[in-house]
Amino acid sequence: MEQPKYKRVVLKLSGEALAGKQGFGIQPAVIQSIAKQVKEVAELDVEIAIVVGGGNIWRGKTGSEMGMDRATADYMGMLATVMNALALQDSLEQLGVETRVQTSIEMRQVAEPYIRRRAIRHLEKKRVVIFAAGTGNPYFSTDTTAALRAAEIEADVILMAKNNVDGVYSADPNIDASAVKYDELSYLDVIQQGLGVMDSTASSLCMDNNIPLIVFSITEEGNIKRAVLGENIGTIVRGK
């Protein structure tokens, strides 16, 4: 068996990653592809926690820009992440991967409430755990959720899967042809240069808790496994 570099990981999936090229909603073929990649990693005896975004269904920021109360808009975004989590759980379980969804806002009919010790126990039993509903608080992004949960469960790394870029660039490569891709960065670089990898709250949490971050493309099948094995893909962010 191939030897993974990381034994416990947090996979951060944006909502857009689940929408695929259609850009909105959940594309079944995409979510099935992601589920297969997660199964590949689980078969290496790696403990996997997943944090899902909700931008494919609703963005709190968009709602607040339309004049909606920011907290209300953010709570709607949290509910969107639960929909994504349940869809991903279903795809994983169809492949025979035991999966649990834990939500930061209680909704016991559909998922467990987030309890740190229970989440760790699930991981130790080699179940995939999907964290939904963000942190349960408005004004915090799902990137911050990923950083927070990674610190809480003592994950070795955060794997940030993107569907429109294959790493961190000096500018948006989809707009600026002269954008330069970075192989390695520090969190201070990310914060000071405003590189848009994750928001400053999430970056600070990762930096303070010394959690490395790998940014890579989800569109190429097998990339999650490559990242876990320590292959040189995407961009790695670490340290100060």
UniProtKB/Swiss-Prot annotation:
Subcellular compartments: Cytoplasm
Keywords, sorted A to Z: Allosteric enzyme, ATP-binding, Cytoplasm, Kinase, Nucleotide-binding, Pyrimidine biosynthesis, Transferase
Protein name: Uridylate kinase
InterPro entries reported for this sequence: AceGlu_kinase-like_sf, Asp/Glu/Uridylate_kinase, Uridylate_kinase, Uridylate_kinase_bac
Quaternary structure (record): Homohexamer.
Family statement drawn from the similarity comment of this UniProt entry: Belongs to the UMP kinase family.
Gene source species: Geobacillus thermodenitrificans (strain NG80-2)
Binding positions for ATP per the UniProt entry: 12-15, 55, 59, 163, 169, 172
Pathway(s) annotated for this protein in UniProt: Pyrimidine metabolism; CTP biosynthesis via de novo pathway; UDP from UMP (UMPK route): step 1/1
